Swiss-Prot record:
Organism: Clostridium acetobutylicum (strain ATCC 824 / DSM 792 / JCM 1419 / IAM 19013 / LMG 5710 / NBRC 13948 / NRRL B-527 / VKM B-1787 / 2291 / W)
Catalysed reaction, written as an equation: L-glutamyl-tRNA(Gln) + L-glutamine + ATP + H2O = L-glutaminyl-tRNA(Gln) + L-glutamate + ADP + phosphate + H(+)
Function: Allows the formation of correctly charged Gln-tRNA(Gln) through the transamidation of misacylated Glu-tRNA(Gln) in organisms which lack glutaminyl-tRNA synthetase. The reaction takes place in the presence of glutamine and ATP through an activated gamma-phospho-Glu-tRNA(Gln).
Protein name: Glutamyl-tRNA(Gln) amidotransferase subunit A 1
NCBIfam families: gatA
Family: Belongs to the amidase family. GatA subfamily.
Amino acid sequence: MELYKLKAHELKDMISKKEVKVEEVTNSFLNRIEEVDEKVNALLYVAKEEAVNTAKELDKKIESGESLSGLSGVPVAIKDNISVKNMQNTCASKILEGYVSPYDATVIENLKKNNGVIIGKANMDEFAMGSSTENSAFKVSKNPWSLERVPGGSSGGSAVAVASLEAPISLGTETGGSVRQPASFCGLVGLKPTYGRISRYGVVAFGSTLDQVGMFARDVEDCALLTQNIAGLDKMDFTTVDTPVQDYSKSLNKDLKGRKIGIPKEFFEEGLDEGVREAVKEAIKVFEENGAEVKECSLPLSDYALAAYYIISSAEASSNLARFDGVRYGYRDAEAENALDLYVKSRSKGFGEEAKRRIMLGTYVLSKGYYDAYYKKALKVRSLIKNDFQRAFKEFDAIITPTTPTPAFRIGEKTKDVLSMYMSDIYTVPVNIAGIPSISVPCGFVSGLPVGLQIMGNYFKEDTLFNLAYSYEQSTKWHDKIANL
């Protein structure tokens, strides 16, 4: 049996029933990585020895009569900006090349506690800044559905790992759509939880008021399983909220009777690919067939979200990335003649083009004379956008839109057109600005490329998202499609 083709919940059940050993499952995925990763460049580090050792330990527990809870030995790929003790944590940047984390992020502690097997560190856009994974200092990840196209970003490697069957589930991070957009491009389920639902302790910061850990899976059940095992309050992250984590498995039912869904007209205007538009419209009919009431609504201020996002996120990046100075850790220029020279040369050579662009933009909008005109104004717009969503959620349980305006674009197509690249996040960014949860699920294909449907929910209503996404998924077969590598 080709175990790497199975989904996480199927593997969990087989391991629990002692039909297969954790080590067998782990080796199946390690062999798959060896077979296909050079084609798609999903991983920056393969944790072969660590994964096999963990698998053997879990098998010993099972043999001694202990039942494994949580993930029960299922492999997980981890984005390379999430700290895993004794593994590299490069953020796909030259400035952190060779850096090894001395501790586990809280989400990794939770994964280990719940018997997950970490199989490798995934490629990404440098410091999570990008929408294509072309900004990695080390390699360009490729979309398994078309190797000439991008997988999306910034969590492109995490998406590719699951879409190419190198891992059944994976962790990424979200600042402006970095899980949902690659999920859409790669035909996966991708969740961005509520800001504060999951700890960010041990995750390298980009935009601190926007960042959130997210997850990739091949179906909604797997996504719910992974979320269940990492969510919750953390004393190490004061932004986490003491709100009970529901049993998400109870939300996995098909009936949508009584559910009210809003369709915002602003997300279906000029710039949306016609094929994507038709796929999403067909998907909306399925929700109605399953009992939901669907009605047009308006989110008029969402048009301003992208501009506000790039001001706020760049300002926060400028502050967060100031710590990479060539002194304490990371890349240190050997030719520097004094302290100032060390800072300038280490940062100039260590950071890539996009990271430097955003640092400069952020420094500019925070500077005297421009703070009020840009940063402060962006924060005011953010508050108005939050209010827009809260008005909508007084009437609707969820809001449905396309995840991205187009399917995956070609590698190199948008690298010289920065604004065009930024526009690929136009439908995902409002969610991060508001801090609400959102899930992307596969809803069809355009010219052989996957298309994603986005479902937005109110704060801490991940259970509602899982209910709606599962209902749609069970009425279609898009989630069962696998890329042919």
